[in-house]
Amino acid sequence: MGQTPEDWGEKPPVALIAGPTASGKSDVAVRLALALKKHGRDAVVINADSAQVYADLRVLSARPSEDEMRGVPHELFGEWDGAEACSAAEWASRAKEEISKAHFTGAVPILVGGTGLYLRTLLEGIAPIPPIDAAIREAIRALPQDEARAALEREDPDASKRLAPADAARTARALEVVRSTGRTLSNWQQHKKGGIGDRVALHPLIMLPDRKWLYARCDRRFELMLDRGAASEVETLLARDLDPSLPVMRAIGVREIAAWLKGEIDRPQMIASGQQATRNYAKRQYTWFRHQPPPDWPRIETFDFKLERVFDGLFQY
């Protein structure tokens, strides 16, 4: 039997398990939920991975199976159809609902995932940027990248220094914001709204295992996905003829398997490129989670740890 909402005090608890793909987050989340259950506390796992939100990517997103869930409630897994793009703001809105539901029933919400933007949006909120003028957006998107960069250097020098020269999408975004609103993107982002970080008692854990071990696991996982039907999953996606710019079509493994299905590359090339794409993604996530979260968030580099020690605050409610 879980606790009642009154038992939480002023700030109800939220557990957070984050880190790169293939780092073992899902397993730790379930272990934590079961450990809490032994202490008389219910828990629910809430997905914070931008690929696992899509119903079309059960295999390629490594969504936990029923056996892996071990009877623990899991929410926001496979909730979006691939024809829709799930933005960070949309995910955060749904996550807030699931967190509130869990707290209302006395359960501990356990956020688990590797999408830093999702987590940051949920905890810190989003900048209330007004809609961008359509004519301004169209004009900026039509600019060659070198002209867009030159304009950004003049109109938002800080953004120009911060963004990579080849990052056309973010360059255009920064430029359209300053031209449409008269304020820079960084200025807007200093006034975020809607975050829950100051309203909950956060119990975070960052999974940062040995990189060599992580990359080897990425390689094994991609091959396992193929054994579990990833090619059929991509074949079904291709048959839907979705917009190639949609997130579901840009998910790790989709492009590589699609190229193989179309006869553009052979199977060994597909496996090698899929594994490389997975490792590259894990590397970017690893770097982000090592440096971006607050320094006082625990970082774990080995699985040889006691949940009750890392999440001691959760077991004291």
From Swiss-Prot:
Keyword Nucleotide-binding appears in the UniProt entry: yes
Sequence positions that bind ATP: G19, P20, T21, A22, S23, G24, K25, S26
Marked site: Interaction with substrate tRNA: T115, R137
Domain of life: Bacteria
Main EC class the enzyme belongs to: transferase
GO BP: any one term: tRNA modification
EC number(s) on file: 2.5.1.75
Entry GO MF terms: ATP binding; tRNA dimethylallyltransferase activity
Cofactors (names): Mg(2+)
Transmembrane residue ranges: none
Swiss-Prot/TrEMBL keywords: ATP-binding, Magnesium, Nucleotide-binding, Transferase, tRNA processing
Region Interaction with substrate tRNA, residue ranges: 49-52
Catalytic activity: adenosine(37) in tRNA + dimethylallyl diphosphate = N(6)-dimethylallyladenosine(37) in tRNA + diphosphate
Binding locations of substrate: T21, A22, S23, G24, K25, S26
Family of the protein in this entry: Belongs to the IPP transferase family.
Quaternary data: Monomer.
PANTHER family (UniProt xref): TRNA DIMETHYLALLYLTRANSFERASE
Role, per record: Catalyzes the transfer of a dimethylallyl group onto the adenine at position 37 in tRNAs that read codons beginning with uridine, leading to the formation of N6-(dimethylallyl)adenosine (i(6)A).
Protein name: tRNA dimethylallyltransferase
